[in-house]
Amino acid sequence: MAKDKGLISPEDFAQLQKYIDYSTKSVSDVLKVFEMNKYCQGDEIGYLGFEQFLKMYLEVEEVPHHLCWTLFWSFHSSQDLDEETESKANVICLSDVYCYFTLLEGGSPEDKLEFTFKLYDMDRNGILDSTEVEKIILQMMRVAEYLDWDVSELRPILQEMMKEMDRDGSGCVSLAEWVRAGATTVPLLVLLGIDMTMKDDGHHIWRPKRFSRPVYCNLCELSIGLGKQGLSCNLCKYIVHDHCAMKAQPCEVSTYAKSRKDIGVQPHVWVRGGCHSGRCDRCQKKIRTYHSLTGLHCVWCHLEIHDDCLQAVGPECDCGLLRDHILPPCSIYPRVLVSGQECKQKTTDVTSLCTPEAFRIEPVSNTHPLLVFINPKSGGKQGQSVLWKFQYILNPRQVFNLKDGPEPGLRFFKDVPQFRVLVCGGDGTVGWILETIDKANFPIVPPVAVLPLGTGNDLARCLRWGRGYEGENLRKILKDIEISKVVYLDRWLLEVIPQQNGEKSDPVPSQIINNYFSIGVDASIAHRFHLMREKYPEKFNSRMKNKLWYLEFATSESIFSTCKKLEESVTVEICGKLLDLSDLSLEGIAVLNIPSMHGGSNLWGDTKRPHGDTCGINQALGSVAKIITDPDILKTCVPDMSDKRLEVVGIEGVIEMGQIYTRLKSAGHRLAKCSEITFQTTKTLPMQVDGEPWMQAPCTIKITHKNQMPMLMGPAPSSSNFFGFWS
């Protein structure tokens, strides 16, 4: 640790962030139960105490020694420590630790800037001297390398940037100078790892970007350089050199109408450059973008034209090919602009334009504005990338980062007629949004489409949105949403009633079933995977690693058969009728609402719907049959997520699950199709609901129909359409 003292590397920070993402505790919760008397002396804590604190905070049995020591050292103001001489005599300030983790959990850029100042102010004198400023520059250089920036010319830019902060010429930077300058100095925010979020209009949302084609700075009009990096605004695609960002013109994107005259009519908003198609949409001739900053693009309709063709294009913008989804700025305005009595009634509680309630929305007629929710943690870095793309192709005020929950977005859209919802994330994210919409009590419930991120995505597969997003054109996906059909998804209430025998269970992850519920072998594998991922999140950072871990746990389960003879410890009632399992040897029972689980495995199997049978049930029974157990009739039953019925399937073991997944076997044991199920268990068993596993002590489980939610079914697949139902 002799080199780079006081610094935590980007790699270490990324590893720490993964641990925090999986932890359920806040730093305040930990400090309430932490043994202060044992590990602390006043406001000081030693290495052993810090290690114990991290274990409690991150909810792990062991923290990697390198990470723990590096983090401990980053809080230390002394310069004579090394790893070989660590002891309880080496102490750090507990309040600094509290501040650091509190800010990681959430905080404004200003708060994070203030904390960063205090972290680098090693002598605690309230100013940053030249040595401390050099440490900050070194840290930013390391982050730049981690972001794959070209750092060959970055140091003098950063030095000049830091010098400009010293407004009084004292040779030092005060806290006030640091916060005032830092909040508006884009490279500083990016390189310190501080997220930039949308404030009010006029602010660029910068992100570092390496350019694979010749591009030119919108400010100085000089080339960025092929393969070099600069900063690109997510909202308007304004591009600048790193050192030009502070002088850049305000962002041209106005996300809402500022005056009454702006309401109702949307003009084009032109930004120079950004003509990536290379062809003018007006005259169809080439736009020569390789030699200079040339051409114009509209940030709303995305037309690309020559500078000379501007006069031939009318002033009014129709929002282009995606007009059905876009809320143009002219349709969003502050409620304070509403005249008369309506204004008095609706503005009494409005104190800030930062709240959804401060705006009124009147969408363009015959459109279906899209409310987009994105889970930035889904699919590795996919979520963040999708967020950036949607901020450009739609109005940024339609796009919501789920780190703040879905409520702000739903409140913003609560009075918007005929809107749709797009959820970008996994099945868990979709379930979260559906539950929140259900509780919001909309008079007309909006239909929900899914852009699947990450692995699994069983519901997205069944709705024809594919097994996972892999960088496809988002405009194509939005056009598919336009022609999608509304279907209704049954949702089921899961009631777990523990027996009064004193045995403790894990918390039940959800009281709602959207996809499936299972007991036994598959839940056992999922539970072991879940525990290992919580303990060692750094080992589960790719799809391939996840699959290998599942394979290892499945192999182990096939050897030990922990759920063998499940029928001896579980009884099943369907609509009050006891299901006979005596002739079967099962290790798992699955209750299916959709024909996909485990990332595309169809345990029920494929069935051709009988001619004229619209309900997936033999015509002789009629469409009102609530329970079917006859094996011959079950052969003709087709799964339907809208029929208010569940399919019950028995699983012989891990080998059978693998055979079904690989299509070597068509299905598991079809046990029943019914509208109500009750399980009685006599021992602790692994269970899972929609992929979330837990261990459950003996209990009674009741599954009953709750309601239906409108979902959007993607268009029928073609041979070249990825977003078909691939299992």
UniProtKB/Swiss-Prot annotation:
Quaternary structure and interacting proteins, as annotated: Monomer.
Zinc fingers (Phorbol-ester/DAG-type) by residue: 203-251, 267-317
Residues in EF-hand domain copies: 108-143, 153-188
Family label: Belongs to the eukaryotic diacylglycerol kinase family.
General function of this protein: Diacylglycerol kinase that converts diacylglycerol/DAG into phosphatidic acid/phosphatidate/PA and regulates the respective levels of these two bioactive lipids. Thereby, acts as a central switch between the signaling pathways activated by these second messengers with different cellular targets and opposite effects in numerous biological processes. Also plays an important role in the biosynthesis of complex lipids. Can also phosphorylate 1-alkyl-2-acylglycerol in vitro as efficiently as diacylglycerol provided it contains an arachidonoyl group.
Source species, domain of life: Eukaryota
Lineage per the UniProt record: Eukaryota, Metazoa, Chordata, Craniata, Vertebrata
Boundaries of every DAGKc domain copy: 365-498
Tissue specificity of this protein: Lymphocytes and oligodendroglial cells.
Activity regulation as described: Stimulated by calcium and phosphatidylserine. Activated by sphingosine.
EC number(s) recorded for this UniProt protein: 2.7.1.107, 2.7.1.93
Entries under InterPro entries matching the protein: ATP-NAD_kinase_N, C1-like_sf, C1_DGKalpha_rpt2, DAG_kinase_typeI_N, DGK, DGK_typeI_N_sf, Diacylglycerol_kin_accessory, Diacylglycerol_kinase_cat_dom
Record-level GO BP terms: diacylglycerol metabolic process; glycerolipid metabolic process; intracellular signal transduction; lipid phosphorylation; phosphatidic acid biosynthetic process; phospholipase C-activating G protein-coupled receptor signaling pathway
Principal place of residence: cytoplasm
This protein's name: Diacylglycerol kinase alpha
Binding positions for Ca(2+) 2 per the UniProt entry: D166, D168, S170, C172, E177
Positions where N6-acetyllysine occurs in the chain: K476
